[in-house]
Amino acid sequence: MLKTVNLGLQYGSRKLFDKVNIQFDKGNCYGIIGANGAGKSTFLKLLSGEIESTEGEVIKDPKERMSVLRQNQNAFDDQTVIKTVLLGHKRLVEIMNEKEVYYAKESLTDEEGMRLSDLEGEFMELNGWEAESDAATLLNGLGVSDEYHYELMGSLDAKIKIKVLLAQALFGNPDILLLDEPTNNLDYKSTRWLENFLLNFDNTVLIVSHDRHFLNNVCTHICDVDYGKIKLYVGNYEFWYESSQLLLQQQKDQNKKAEQKAKELQEFIARFSANKSKARQATSRKKLLDKLVLTDIEPSSRKYPFIGFKQAREVGNDILIVDNLTKKGLFENLSFTVRKGDKIDFLAENSMIITTLFNILLGKEEADSGSYKWGITTSVSYLMQDNKEFFSDERLDLINWLRQFSPDDQTESFIRGWLGRMLFSGEESMKKSTVLSGGEKVRCILAKMMLESGNVLIMEDPTNHLDLESITALNEGMTSFKGNILFSSHDAELLETVANRIISFEGNGIKDKMTTYEEYLDSLKD
């Protein structure tokens, strides 16, 4: 059991949390959601004791073990991969180390013998004899193969380290599990394995994630962090979204009816209050007016940008022909044709394959051999992860930054309107383009793409850095777009709802199927 009592956190004059009372029970998986900056990760740090609250308290059974997904990738560089996973259970490692000390001695005193016996008993209770085997099972499930298990962490690349730290958090059947963005940098196989692990996990789990598909599959409850309060909903992310939108609409409709009724009553009172024959009715209407109450709709920090892509001209039948394209070390003799209406998701375990392919198609990089040809009616807009080329001029504020990509002779109010649609209002539109966060840069690029009105979109991991609200808006924009899209993503919900064709790089070739993402995953099981 884990709960908070009147929990509060204040930085200067800003209250991040105010009198939060919530309880997390065994057997449930809680998704922590909220706008960027709402305090989701900070809340997990309060629960884990990494930071202290300014008021109230966190209550946890001292007998229960809490495990936290760490983000410190370099903290275990001098440890082997297996040992790093075992370090997820500190007490178990302490016992192992103390046992080694006693077994290294030639003889033991009676007291030391008793101590060793106690350690062996506790070691067995903690399933210590299977510890390395259990650690290996977790690693293999997350895609870290046997060849890495006894390598030093310092010799591994960042993506493998992240998986090892996730295995560390999962190790040893913790009573309470706190996971902050656990699916970041996981491929779809590792993500599906993690989903199955959590679905079969019997203890308490709290997760911060921007992956809607993941939250839908594993969560039994949703904790909505908004303006210092946390509201608890029963159900997964999709149920929360639909029910919260329905409740908000019902409140608005109820208020609209109340306002209309109030207007009618006021008009009657104004017309007949001086009329003796109608005075009693006017007084009655006034009493009704006094009883009318408008529902107080609480303000929310959750804001959805407007994202909608329109084509300046409809594309013809010839979109793109790729013929025997080769880039050594990445792909060879790659050939495919893009047809009108295709929304193609590109999948590859090595993300550099897709990045390089997109750069070649955009003319930013040369292929070693082969060719590609765009149709004469195509106009391409793009969003790539490396977007430094657009944000290097320190002189440009957001108004003048977006003006570069706007139709000629557009007014400042036109530019401000577009920025407002992407949640840059008031003084925010005067920000220098070089100081933007990752998510702000992506929203700016999306505004640029909308203004360009291309009929072909190339998008590399477009949901990276975005909050759930922006991801939802982007998903709707890509789904409703009438042109062609070539994209890559780790967001399963986006893949499932947007893609109608999958091109996956496998071995030395590709698999090209007209299929949905879910059907593609099902085909892998056959």
Model-found features: residue ranges?
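Amphipathic heptad-repeat alpha-helical coiled-coil/stalk segments that mediate oligomerization
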Residues: 297-321
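ABC ATP-binding cassette signature C-motif
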Residues: 1-253, 312-526
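Intracellular alpha-helical coupling/juxtamembrane segments of multi-pass membrane proteins
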Residues: 240-268, 272-296
